[in-house]
Curated annotation (Swiss-Prot):
GO terms for molecular function: DNA binding; DNA-binding transcription factor activity. Residues 6-25 bind DNA. Regulates the induction of katG (catalase-peroxidase) in stationary phase. PANTHER family: HTH-TYPE TRANSCRIPTIONAL ACTIVATOR MTA, REDOX-CYCLING DRUG-SENSING TRANSCRIPTIONAL ACTIVATOR SOXR. SMART domains: HTH_MERR (SM00422). Residues 3-72 form the HTH merR-type domain. This is HTH-type transcriptional regulator SkgA. The gene is skgA. Transmembrane segments: none annotated. Gene3D superfamilies: 1.10.1660.10, Antibiotic binding domain of TipA-like multidrug resistance regulators. Keywords: Activator, DNA-binding, Transcription, Transcription regulation. It comes from the Bacteria.
Length: 255
Protein backbone atom coordinates (compact mmCIF):
# COMPACT_ATOMS: atom_id res chain seq x y z
CA UNK A 1 0.00 0.00 0.00
CA UNK A 2 1.34 3.42 -0.98
CA UNK A 3 2.03 5.97 1.75
CA UNK A 4 2.25 9.70 1.11
CA UNK A 5 3.77 12.61 2.99
CA UNK A 6 1.76 15.81 3.26
CA UNK A 7 3.76 17.38 0.42
CA UNK A 8 3.17 14.35 -1.80
CA UNK A 9 -0.52 14.44 -0.89
CA UNK A 10 -0.65 18.12 -1.84
CA UNK A 11 1.03 17.52 -5.21
CA UNK A 12 -1.22 14.57 -5.98
CA UNK A 13 -4.50 16.30 -5.08
CA UNK A 14 -3.80 19.95 -5.87
CA UNK A 15 -4.78 20.87 -2.29
CA UNK A 16 -2.25 23.11 -0.56
CA UNK A 17 -0.14 21.89 2.37
CA UNK A 18 -1.66 24.70 4.42
CA UNK A 19 -5.17 23.39 3.71
CA UNK A 20 -4.17 19.82 4.61
CA UNK A 21 -2.74 21.07 7.91
CA UNK A 22 -6.02 22.93 8.51
CA UNK A 23 -8.07 19.81 7.75
CA UNK A 24 -5.92 17.90 10.24
CA UNK A 25 -6.36 20.59 12.91
CA UNK A 26 -10.17 20.56 12.65
CA UNK A 27 -10.38 16.77 12.45
CA UNK A 28 -11.71 16.67 8.90
CA UNK A 29 -8.77 14.71 7.48
CA UNK A 30 -6.37 13.21 9.99
CA UNK A 31 -3.22 11.52 8.66
CA UNK A 32 -3.07 7.75 9.03
CA UNK A 33 0.10 8.13 11.09
CA UNK A 34 2.52 10.74 12.38
CA UNK A 35 6.17 9.73 12.45
CA UNK A 36 8.69 10.38 15.20
CA UNK A 37 10.01 13.16 12.96
CA UNK A 38 6.58 14.85 13.07
CA UNK A 39 5.82 14.06 9.42
CA UNK A 40 2.22 13.26 8.51
CA UNK A 41 1.64 10.08 6.47
CA UNK A 42 -1.48 9.33 4.42
CA UNK A 43 -2.71 6.16 2.70
CA UNK A 44 -5.27 5.38 -0.01
CA UNK A 45 -8.22 5.57 2.40
CA UNK A 46 -7.12 9.09 3.22
CA UNK A 47 -6.95 9.88 -0.51
CA UNK A 48 -10.54 8.69 -0.93
CA UNK A 49 -11.66 10.79 2.04
CA UNK A 50 -9.93 13.84 0.55
CA UNK A 51 -11.66 13.13 -2.75
CA UNK A 52 -14.98 13.16 -0.88
CA UNK A 53 -14.07 16.49 0.71
CA UNK A 54 -13.33 17.97 -2.71
CA UNK A 55 -16.56 16.64 -4.21
CA UNK A 56 -18.50 18.18 -1.31
CA UNK A 57 -16.65 21.48 -1.76
CA UNK A 58 -17.55 21.47 -5.46
CA UNK A 59 -21.17 21.07 -4.35
CA UNK A 60 -20.77 24.04 -1.95
CA UNK A 61 -21.15 21.99 1.24
CA UNK A 62 -19.84 23.79 4.38
CA UNK A 63 -16.81 22.11 6.00
CA UNK A 64 -18.67 21.29 9.24
CA UNK A 65 -21.38 19.51 7.25
CA UNK A 66 -18.78 17.60 5.23
CA UNK A 67 -17.24 16.26 8.42
CA UNK A 68 -20.64 15.25 9.80
CA UNK A 69 -21.48 13.42 6.57
CA UNK A 70 -18.18 11.54 6.35
CA UNK A 71 -18.14 10.57 10.03
CA UNK A 72 -21.70 9.31 10.27
CA UNK A 73 -22.01 5.63 11.30
CA UNK A 74 -22.37 3.29 8.35
CA UNK A 75 -21.08 5.82 5.81
CA UNK A 76 -21.30 4.20 2.35
CA UNK A 77 -18.69 5.60 -0.04
CA UNK A 78 -20.24 4.07 -3.16
CA UNK A 79 -23.69 5.44 -2.29
CA UNK A 80 -22.17 8.86 -1.60
CA UNK A 81 -20.43 8.85 -4.98
CA UNK A 82 -23.66 7.95 -6.79
CA UNK A 83 -25.53 10.78 -5.06
CA UNK A 84 -22.72 13.22 -5.85
CA UNK A 85 -22.69 12.12 -9.48
CA UNK A 86 -26.40 12.90 -9.75
CA UNK A 87 -25.98 16.36 -8.23
CA UNK A 88 -22.89 17.16 -10.30
CA UNK A 89 -24.68 16.08 -13.48
CA UNK A 90 -27.50 18.50 -12.66
CA UNK A 91 -24.94 21.25 -12.06
CA UNK A 92 -23.19 20.42 -15.32
CA UNK A 93 -26.47 20.85 -17.17
CA UNK A 94 -27.03 24.25 -15.53
CA UNK A 95 -23.45 25.36 -16.27
CA UNK A 96 -23.90 24.29 -19.88
CA UNK A 97 -26.89 26.64 -20.07
CA UNK A 98 -24.79 29.42 -18.52
CA UNK A 99 -22.01 28.84 -21.07
CA UNK A 100 -24.60 29.11 -23.82
CA UNK A 101 -25.85 32.41 -22.35
CA UNK A 102 -22.25 33.71 -22.23
CA UNK A 103 -21.70 32.76 -25.88
CA UNK A 104 -24.95 34.37 -26.99
CA UNK A 105 -24.27 37.53 -24.97
CA UNK A 106 -20.79 37.82 -26.50
CA UNK A 107 -22.27 37.33 -29.96
CA UNK A 108 -24.77 40.10 -29.19
CA UNK A 109 -22.06 42.47 -27.93
CA UNK A 110 -19.92 41.78 -31.00
CA UNK A 111 -22.84 42.35 -33.35
CA UNK A 112 -23.09 38.79 -34.65
CA UNK A 113 -26.65 38.31 -33.41
CA UNK A 114 -29.33 40.09 -31.39
CA UNK A 115 -30.19 38.58 -28.01
CA UNK A 116 -33.59 39.19 -26.43
CA UNK A 117 -33.22 40.78 -22.97
CA UNK A 118 -35.39 38.07 -21.43
CA UNK A 119 -32.66 35.50 -22.21
CA UNK A 120 -29.90 37.39 -20.37
CA UNK A 121 -30.42 35.56 -17.09
CA UNK A 122 -31.22 32.03 -18.22
CA UNK A 123 -29.35 29.48 -16.13
CA UNK A 124 -28.99 31.65 -13.03
CA UNK A 125 -30.49 30.43 -9.77
CA UNK A 126 -33.21 32.82 -8.50
CA UNK A 127 -33.91 30.55 -5.51
CA UNK A 128 -30.30 30.90 -4.31
CA UNK A 129 -30.51 34.70 -4.63
CA UNK A 130 -33.79 34.70 -2.69
CA UNK A 131 -32.22 32.55 0.06
CA UNK A 132 -29.27 34.90 0.26
CA UNK A 133 -31.49 37.97 0.60
CA UNK A 134 -33.66 36.25 3.24
CA UNK A 135 -30.53 35.33 5.23
CA UNK A 136 -29.33 38.94 5.14
CA UNK A 137 -32.67 40.31 6.33
CA UNK A 138 -32.91 37.68 9.08
CA UNK A 139 -29.44 38.48 10.43
CA UNK A 140 -29.19 42.22 9.73
CA UNK A 141 -32.81 43.41 9.75
CA UNK A 142 -33.97 46.70 8.25
CA UNK A 143 -30.46 47.82 7.28
CA UNK A 144 -30.12 44.78 5.01
CA UNK A 145 -33.54 45.49 3.49
CA UNK A 146 -32.42 49.04 2.65
CA UNK A 147 -29.11 47.83 1.20
CA UNK A 148 -30.85 45.26 -1.00
CA UNK A 149 -33.29 47.92 -2.23
CA UNK A 150 -30.42 50.34 -2.98
CA UNK A 151 -28.50 47.66 -4.85
CA UNK A 152 -31.49 46.65 -6.95
CA UNK A 153 -32.27 50.28 -7.74
CA UNK A 154 -28.71 50.89 -8.91
CA UNK A 155 -28.55 47.72 -11.00
CA UNK A 156 -31.93 48.26 -12.62
CA UNK A 157 -30.40 50.44 -15.31
CA UNK A 158 -27.46 48.13 -16.02
CA UNK A 159 -27.06 46.81 -19.51
CA UNK A 160 -25.42 43.64 -20.79
CA UNK A 161 -21.93 45.14 -20.77
CA UNK A 162 -22.34 46.38 -17.18
CA UNK A 163 -23.33 42.92 -15.93
CA UNK A 164 -20.54 41.22 -17.84
CA UNK A 165 -17.87 43.58 -16.47
CA UNK A 166 -19.27 43.31 -12.93
CA UNK A 167 -19.16 39.51 -12.93
CA UNK A 168 -15.73 39.33 -14.56
CA UNK A 169 -14.26 41.72 -11.99
CA UNK A 170 -15.66 39.61 -9.13
CA UNK A 171 -14.01 36.50 -10.56
CA UNK A 172 -10.74 38.36 -11.11
CA UNK A 173 -10.70 39.61 -7.51
CA UNK A 174 -11.35 36.11 -6.16
CA UNK A 175 -8.68 34.60 -8.42
CA UNK A 176 -6.05 37.19 -7.49
CA UNK A 177 -6.80 36.91 -3.78
CA UNK A 178 -6.61 33.10 -3.90
CA UNK A 179 -3.21 33.45 -5.58
CA UNK A 180 -2.07 35.81 -2.82
CA UNK A 181 -3.25 33.27 -0.24
CA UNK A 182 -1.28 30.43 -1.82
CA UNK A 183 1.78 32.70 -1.99
CA UNK A 184 1.47 33.33 1.75
CA UNK A 185 1.17 37.11 1.43
CA UNK A 186 0.07 38.94 4.62
CA UNK A 187 -3.42 40.42 4.46
CA UNK A 188 -1.98 43.92 4.95
CA UNK A 189 0.72 43.56 2.27
CA UNK A 190 0.76 45.98 -0.66
CA UNK A 191 -0.46 43.43 -3.27
CA UNK A 192 -3.40 42.33 -1.09
CA UNK A 193 -4.25 45.95 -0.27
CA UNK A 194 -4.41 46.66 -4.01
CA UNK A 195 -6.82 43.75 -4.47
CA UNK A 196 -8.95 45.02 -1.58
CA UNK A 197 -9.04 48.48 -3.16
CA UNK A 198 -10.59 46.86 -6.23
CA UNK A 199 -13.02 44.94 -4.04
CA UNK A 200 -13.95 48.17 -2.21
CA UNK A 201 -14.85 49.73 -5.57
CA UNK A 202 -16.71 46.58 -6.64
CA UNK A 203 -18.78 46.56 -3.43
CA UNK A 204 -19.56 50.26 -3.90
CA UNK A 205 -20.84 49.55 -7.36
CA UNK A 206 -22.93 46.65 -6.07
CA UNK A 207 -24.40 48.70 -3.21
CA UNK A 208 -24.93 51.78 -5.37
CA UNK A 209 -22.90 53.81 -2.83
CA UNK A 210 -19.41 53.77 -1.35
CA UNK A 211 -19.19 51.50 1.71
CA UNK A 212 -18.07 52.88 5.05
CA UNK A 213 -15.02 51.17 6.61
CA UNK A 214 -17.28 49.57 9.25
CA UNK A 215 -19.70 48.31 6.60
CA UNK A 216 -16.85 46.89 4.51
CA UNK A 217 -15.39 45.09 7.52
CA UNK A 218 -18.89 43.87 8.40
CA UNK A 219 -19.25 42.42 4.92
CA UNK A 220 -16.08 40.46 5.59
CA UNK A 221 -17.70 39.01 8.72
CA UNK A 222 -20.75 38.13 6.62
CA UNK A 223 -18.57 36.14 4.21
CA UNK A 224 -17.52 33.96 7.15
CA UNK A 225 -20.99 33.70 8.69
CA UNK A 226 -23.01 32.91 5.57
CA UNK A 227 -22.63 29.25 4.49
CA UNK A 228 -23.15 30.01 0.79
CA UNK A 229 -20.33 32.56 0.73
CA UNK A 230 -18.12 30.18 2.72
CA UNK A 231 -18.84 27.31 0.35
CA UNK A 232 -18.11 29.50 -2.68
CA UNK A 233 -14.75 30.75 -1.43
CA UNK A 234 -13.59 27.43 0.03
CA UNK A 235 -14.31 25.82 -3.35
CA UNK A 236 -11.88 28.31 -4.92
CA UNK A 237 -9.14 27.77 -2.32
CA UNK A 238 -9.22 26.25 1.17
CA UNK A 239 -8.85 29.00 3.75
CA UNK A 240 -9.90 31.74 1.31
CA UNK A 241 -12.99 32.75 3.32
CA UNK A 242 -11.00 33.63 6.45
CA UNK A 243 -8.22 35.24 4.40
CA UNK A 244 -10.75 37.33 2.45
CA UNK A 245 -12.46 38.47 5.64
CA UNK A 246 -9.18 39.36 7.37
CA UNK A 247 -8.00 41.27 4.29
CA UNK A 248 -11.21 43.29 4.23
CA UNK A 249 -10.87 44.18 7.91
CA UNK A 250 -7.22 45.14 7.42
CA UNK A 251 -8.16 47.37 4.49
CA UNK A 252 -11.03 48.95 6.45
CA UNK A 253 -8.68 49.80 9.33
CA UNK A 254 -6.49 51.72 6.91
CA UNK A 255 -9.31 53.86 5.50
Amino acid sequence: MSVYTVKQMARLSGVSVRALHHYDAIGLLKPRAVGANGYRYYDRQDLLRLQQILFHRALETPLKDIQAALDQPGFDLAAALRAQRERLAAQAERYARLVDVVDRTLADLEGDETMDDKHLFEGFDPEKQARHEAWLVEHYGDEATRRIADAKAGMKSWGKKDWSQFQEEAKAIEHDLAKALTQGLPVDSAPVTAIMRRHWAWVGRSWNREPTPDAFAGLGHLYQANPEFTARYEAIAPGLTEYFSEAMRAFARGR
